Each structure stands twice: as C-alpha cells, then as structure tokens.
Amino acid sequence: MPEGHTIHRLAARHAELFAGDKVHAASPQGRFADGAARLSGTVLDGTEAYGKHLLHHYAGELTLHVHLGLYGKVTDGPGEPPPPVGQIRLRLTSDGSRSRRGGRRAELESSDDRHWLDLRGPTACELLTPPEVAALRDRLGPDPLRADADPERAYARIRRSTTPLAALLLDQTVVAGTGLIFVVEALFRAGLPPLLPGRKLTPAGWAELWADLVALMTVAVERGRIDTVRDVHLPEAMGRAPRVDRHGGEVYVYRRPGVPCHVCGTEVSRGALAGRNLYWCATCQAG
C-alpha cells in the first residue's frame, strides 16, 4: 500500500496538472458513473493529502475522496487520453481553459494545456460533502507531512496504551500516513524496540520520534522514494553494494531479515504483529 509521501506527491501533481481547469469525468468501468457525471464540467479548486487519503476539492463543495488501498494506481499524461484499457474506475481530462501562470506549469512538456488522469483499483473512490470531509479528518491521527499536524494528539493516545509502539504507529487513527517502512525504520533510528508498550515511550522520546518521521517523510516526498540511512551508512561510505529492492531506497531493517545490521553487524530480526512483518535489530533496539 502506498505510504503517505506518495499520496502527497499525487496531490501536488494533480494540482499542477488540473487545478483551475474544468474537468470532464468518466467511469469506463462503470462503478463510478454517477459520481463522474456530477464532477463533469466542474473546476478543480485544489487538492490535498491527509495520511493515505487523496482529496480533490471542486467548485460547488464537491470533494472527490480516493484511497488507493493495496491495489490502486494512478497514471496521467498530456494531451488526449489513450483508449481505455483495463478497469478504469475514473478518468479525468482537463479542458485546458486556465491560462498559463508560469512556474512549474510552464515547464510541462505538452503540445497543449490538456491532461488526463486514470484511476484503477482503489479501495475508495467517492464524493464527499463538507461534513463528511470533516468527519474523515477527525477520525485520522495527525499527518507528519501536514503543517496543521498536532503530534500531542497522537501522544495522548500512545502514552495511555499498552499496545506495542509499532502497532500504534501503524494505526491511522493515531498517526496518519505512516506505513510499515516508515514505522520500522523510524523505530530503528530512535533505538526503540517495536514491541515496546506505548505507555513506556517518554515525552522526549516521542518528540524525537515525531521529528524524525517528519524529516524522513519530507525527504521521501522530495525524492519519490524512501531513504532512511544516514550518510555514514550509505553504500559509498561503507564500501557495500547498494540495496536492490522493488521499493528502492536505502534502509536499515525493512525487508533485510538475516543480514547484518549496517550499524552493529547483528543479524536483522523478523517477527509478526497483527498479521504484518516487523523488522528490527535486537542490539540497536534493545530499549
């Protein structure tokens, strides 16, 4: 499942391509036909990401809510869209009516100002009213990538809980946007065992952990991949081979079970928590 940085990148991309334009919406698959009909002809006012949720805000207080889930995928391109292939839940095309405003928009390599977007396989694709958008935000924890995030709201949950810290950080009602990679890597960098009960995390420990999540996720937005390894542990600094993994990026423990820790040489451990794999270093994260 895409982690929060991916959704923030999509929100920025869609604003760049479509904000200020009227859009034509269609559902080639048919499952979002009514919603697409309501969107067609409206102007996209702006976009935002909240955790793993993507929101398009249209004129007339229409909000498109998308959650990609495990299988969702978004593609886009310039000009006329290609013939529909596969199960396209939603296709958006812009009419190119907005004037060029310079900046990154002017850098787009396109023969005209029109663009298209295809959404396939999302867990959620729906229109929300303003109260429903507010309810969605209210049920999510703070998002480390948002300026309005209140980390103390998350810590209020964590410090009262006996639930393992890794499980709390994966709970989107506690912290929004964090997935397994960010969680296991941030815990490693903080030297915290993933099974540490939440109530044992000190205020200072939480402040450090939150700040590191903000930093790691911000870098991931900028680079388009998750890199968590400090400079001293990069391949060129250690004289080791780069990581080869479909997720890309350099990490400490994620999907590295049985191989030496970059810091201490202990074999990275793997365990399970609520049906999900966990990765940690028993030496560096002794607690």
Where are these regions (language model features)?
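Structured catalytic/nucleic-acid-binding cores of DNA maintenance enzymes
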Residues: 1-287
